[in-house]
Amino acid sequence: MKNLIRPMEIGDKKQSIDMMREFYLSPALITNGSEEIFNANVDNCIGNSQYVEGYVFCDGDTILGYAMIAKSFSTEFGKHCIWIEDLYIKEQYRKQGIGSSFFKFIEEKYEGCLFRLEVEKGNEKAINTYKKADFTELPYLEMKK
């Protein structure tokens, strides 16, 4: 299987939102999202947003999963920061190296940047995947308003 990582396009909107619904209902997240949020996410990914990018993972015409990144600057580390916001691979395509390929792709595209992501403490499969990609835990409690 030759996987392709490409930017999200308008024709991917329905499938991307379908995957977001599944992802946001999983134990990987503490929020369920909403149709308004899913549409805004995809619209910003396929638009010209300077803050967010969306990607789909494909094998030919078959979409295997998606990812979204957000861009910021880390004053703590003194460099641009790429937040891997969503990384979802359909169940039947997991453990085929798609996540690893995405990490390599994004690290090459944004060489020299800091990469961050969030993971639920009990999501051992994801934690192990991220550790294999050289992510390390930060001892912070995250807060929002």
Name each model-derived stretch.
Residues 116-127, 144-145:
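Conserved beta-strand-loop-alpha-helix junction that forms the acyl-donor binding cleft
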Residues 44-56:
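A short helix-loop-beta-strand connector motif used in the catalytic cores of GNAT acetyltransferases and
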Residues 79-91:
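Conserved acetyl-CoA binding element of GNAT-fold acetyltransferases
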Residues 3-18:
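A short beta-loop-alpha structural element at the N-terminal edge
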Residues 89, 95-108, 128, 132:
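Conserved acetyl-CoA-binding loop-helix of GNAT-fold acetyltransferases
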Residues 21-43:
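Conserved GNAT-fold acetyl-CoA-binding loop/helix
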Residues 54-56, 62-71:
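Conserved beta-strand in the GNAT
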Residues 103, 110-120:
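Conserved GNAT acetyl-CoA-binding A-motif
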